[in-house]
From Swiss-Prot:
Binds 1 zinc ion per subunit. GO terms for molecular function: metal ion binding. It comes from the Archaea. It comes from Sulfolobus acidocaldarius (strain ATCC 33909 / DSM 639 / JCM 8929 / NBRC 15157 / NCIMB 11770). Its cofactor is Zn(2+). Keywords: Metal-binding, Pyrimidine biosynthesis, Zinc. Belongs to the PyrI family. This is Aspartate carbamoyltransferase regulatory chain. Signal peptide: none annotated. Disulfide bonds: none annotated.
Length: 164
């Protein structure tokens, strides 16, 4: 948004139907698209606003995806790389659902323990399970071997899994 005098002007027009993901930490908009599996050839009209000023965050990113409503599963993945994000579902230019993402207390089967000696690395029936220790910065602990992973490891795993 640009402010001229006393009025605000939109940098990007409103979308008729789709999803607006707001309050993404600055520089992570492309990671959000990656998590959603959006490469650019799917036919969705997408707007990215990167490093825009934010009163709450200093700088933030915004992603607008026309004609796509993201699923709960996709929202859960976004939470791990953009825990401050808000997801707005838009229909006929109106926000019909607004969800403030929250880091889950426990994450099962999404992340892998980097410890090669962890039982989850060697037993296919052991489901990797992580408990959130802190949200800022994001740190999680393996429930089996107590290995701690940080935000960088989490992003690396999630983005790596989506590039396969």
């Amino acid at each position: 948004m640009e402010i001229q005098g006393n009025r605000k002007e939109l940098m990007v027009s409103k979308i008729k139907n789709g999803t607006v993901i707001d309050h993404i930490p600055a520089g992570r908009a492309f990671a959000v698209l990656n998590v959603l599996g959006i490469k650019g050839h799917e036919g969705f009209r997408i707007a990215l606003v990167i490093n825009v000023d934010s009163k709450k965050m200093g700088k933030k990113d915004i992603v607008k995806i026309e004609d796509k409503e993201i699923s709960d599963t996709e929202a859960n993945l976004i939470t791990l790389i953009a825990p401050t994000a808000t997801i707005n579902i838009v229909r006929e230019y109106e926000v019909v659902k607004k969800t403030k993402l929250e880091v889950p207390k426990v994450v099962k089967g999404i992340l892998k323990c980097p410890n090669p000696y962890c039982i989850t690395s060697n037993d296919v029936e052991a489901i990797p399970t992580f408990k959130t220790l802190t949200e800022k910065p994001l740190k999680m602990r393996c429930e089996y071997c107590e290995t701690i992973i940080d935000e960088n490891e989490i992003m690396s795993q999630i983005l790596g899994a989506n590039n396969k």
